[in-house]
């Protein structure tokens, strides 16, 4: 009998991957965690039935959430990562010798433990000496921090369940306070394509705009995320990613599978329907 993983993107659209075997299934205090093995996408894991990471396409997401801000400000030294229990965001950050400290706040320790065992491709740098792990609520963590970080990356789940608090006005305001005077905030910004995801995207964008003087959105194509069209938010107290001297990033000699400085410029060029959504977030 064939085994298929199926995710409902809407009540009328489903996405499926043929599964060779289920490697893990468990429930933490926060969510259900499943790990599957497939021929097409390698090992992948889901939270409450929603796709988080696959071995085959994780490089796209992690390249874009890390290298865009790092190319915008090459002097980033102290980083806070919220969520990111699979470790892929931390893995990419550790490639920068200039980074001195990475604090990672993940509410669910079991996610990290499972990814260490079944997804070493993404979790293999969590033991880097610059990395400190905090298993607590990211919303509460940033409340007590002020003027500490050069970069905050919010690598969260969708705006419901354990990740819901990471899409609030209070949270973004606390991130602003936790950043230094030239700090950058980057977050996964959902998809603009399906209505439910678009609502979450617009709500998050509106709240970030209320907090930061520089607020932009960029995009990537991620095959296993709903619609494949995925957005990221870029907010800053000072730096505009389109006016930065990003060519200096090439001098670092980092080998990436997705990100490059041409793509950096192009990813901020948005389709008209997305531009209209962002222009109308106040309505």
Swiss-Prot record:
EC numbers on record: 2.5.1.16
Q: Its GO biological process terms?
A: spermidine biosynthetic process
Q: Where is it localised?
A: Cytoplasm
What pathway does this protein act in? Amine and polyamine biosynthesis; spermidine biosynthesis; spermidine from putrescine: step 1/1
Q: Which residues bind spermidine?
A: 62, 86, 155-158
**Catalysed reaction per UniProt?**
S-adenosyl 3-(methylsulfanyl)propylamine + putrescine = S-methyl-5'-thioadenosine + spermidine + H(+)
What InterPro entries does this protein map onto?
A: PABS, SAM-dependent_MTases_sf, Spermi_synthase, Spermidine_synt_N, Spermidine_synt_N_sf
The UniProt entry lists the main location of this chain as cytoplasm
Q: Which UniProt keywords apply?
A: Cytoplasm, Polyamine biosynthesis, Spermidine biosynthesis, Transferase
Q: Which PANTHER family does the entry mention?
A: SPERMIDINE SYNTHASE (PTHR11558:SF11), SPERMIDINE/SPERMINE SYNTHASE (PTHR11558)
**The name this protein goes by in its record:** Polyamine aminopropyltransferase
Write down the species: Clostridium perfringens (strain SM101 / Type A)
């Amino acid at each position: 009998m064939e085994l298929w993983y199926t995710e409902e993107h809407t009540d009328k659209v489903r996405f499926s991957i043929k599964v060779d075997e289920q490697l893990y299934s468990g429930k933490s205090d926060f969510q259900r965690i499943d790990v599957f093995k497939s021929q097409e996408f390698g090992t992948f894991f889901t939270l409450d039935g929603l796709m988080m990471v696959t071995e085959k396409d994780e490089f796209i997401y992690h390249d874009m959430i890390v290298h865009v801000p790092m190319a915008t400000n090459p002097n980033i030294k102290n980083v806070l990562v919220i969520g990111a229990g699979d470790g892929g965001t931390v893995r990419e950050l550790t490639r920068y010798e200039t980074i001195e400290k990475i604090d990672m706040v993940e509410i669910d320790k079991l996610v990290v433990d499972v990814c260490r065992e079944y997804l070493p491709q993404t979790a293999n740098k969590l033991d880097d000496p610059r990395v400190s792990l905090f298993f607590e609520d990211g919303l509460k963590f940033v409340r007590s921090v002020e003027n500490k970080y050069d970069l905050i990356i919010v690598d969260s789940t969708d705006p419901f369940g354990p990740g819901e608090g990471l899409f609030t006005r209070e949270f973004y305001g606390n991130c602003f306070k936790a950043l230094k005077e030239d700090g950058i905030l980057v977050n996964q910004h959902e998809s603009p394509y399906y209505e439910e995801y678009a609502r979450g995207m617009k709500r998050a964008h509106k709240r970030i705009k209320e907090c930061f003087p520089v607020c932009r959105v960029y995009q990537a194509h991620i095959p296993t995320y709903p619609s494949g069209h995925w957005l990221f938010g870029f907010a800053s107290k000072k730096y505009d990613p389109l006016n930065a001297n990003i060519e200096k990033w090439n001098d670092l000699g980092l080998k990436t599978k997705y990100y490059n400085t041409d793509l950096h410029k192009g990813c901020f060029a948005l389709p008209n329907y997305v531009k209209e959504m962002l222009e109308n977030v106040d309505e």
